Design a protein with these regions (language model features):
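Surface-exposed acidic/polar loop and edge beta-strand patches at domain peripheries
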Residues: 2-129
Length: 129
C-alpha cells in the first residue's frame, strides 16, 4: 500500500488496489472525511467498510475496524459479510420460505436449509453505482 499525493488518506489505502471490473462494473474505493479528522474508506463492491479512522482523546488517529486493504482481499475473504452491506433481508429466513399477500415464495438457501442475508446474490456481492 502506497500513499501518493493523488490518493492521500489517513488509512494508507491505495485506490488502485480497489480498482477492477466485476461483471462489467468498475469497482473503486471512496474516502469520506470531515474537518475533525474522521475518515471512512468504503468500497463500492458490497459497500464494504475498509477503514474507519478516528482520533482518540489525545488526537492520535487509528483504524477501528477490521477492514480490507485491497479488492482481492475483499473478494477472497471467508467472512463474506464482514464490513459489507447485507440484504435484501438481514438474518435468516427459515427454510428460505415466506408468504406475502397470500403468495408463497421460495428463496435460495445458503445457510443450511435457510436463506441468510440476501442469499447467494446478496448486497455484499454487488458492485454499487
Amino acid at each position: 500500500m502506497t500513499n501518493t499525493a493523488e490518493n492521500a488518506n489517513l488509512c494508507g489505502l491505495n485506490r488502485k488496489d480497489f480498482q477492477t471490473t466485476i461483471n462489467g462494473k468498475k469497482t473503486d474505493l471512496y474516502i469520506l472525511r470531515n474537518r475533525k479528522g474522521y475518515e471512512v474508506a468504503i468500497s463500492n463492491y458490497g459497500g464494504a467498510i475498509c477503514a474507519i479512522m478516528v482520533p482518540d482523546k489525545d488526537g492520535n488517529v487509528a483504524n477501528v475496524v477490521q477492514g480490507f486493504d485491497s479488492i482481492q482481499a475483499l473478494m477472497e475473504t471467508d467472512e463474506i459479510y464482514r464490513s459489507t452491506l447485507i440484504g435484501r433481508y438481514g438474518n435468516r429466513i427459515c427454510k428460505g420460505r415466506f408468504t406475502l399477500n397470500g403468495k408463497d415464495y421460495q428463496l435460495a438457501t445458503n445457510d443450511g436449509p435457510n436463506h441468510l442475508h440476501g442469499g447467494n446474490k446478496g448486497y455484499n456481492l454487488r458492485v454499487w453505482d
